[in-house]
Amino acid sequence: MAQNETPIILDETEQKIINIIDAHRDQIIDFAKDIYTHAELGYKEFRTAEKFANFMKDLGLPTKEHLAVTGVKAYLNEEKKDNVSLALIGELDALRIPEHKYANPETQGAHCCGH
């Protein structure tokens, strides 16, 4: 840390997030690679939703599934202890771009939205 820098102080929730990410780094990378190579089009992400829900459960996080067709919520703090709530939103649907280098041959979908 540079001499003038203020140290970053994390609260309990922030530290819990960092710890989960650090402890599961390789699993997170493998998950991302798997989703990338098995792209599914919007409202048809059934494999993706199931894989995400199972991944969150493996991390010990309670989930709610089948929200708005393929949506999944995972709770870091389901009981809202200390009035803290956290949302992580990710769009995991793909665009139909069959000519893309990494397009899923089954769905012709590719993750190349850029958002």
Stretches found by the model and what they are:
Residues 3-112:
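Acidic/His- and Gly-rich active-site-bordering loop/insert found
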Residues 115:
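Short, conserved phosphate/pyrophosphate- and ester-handling motifs at nucleotide-, phospho-/glycolipid
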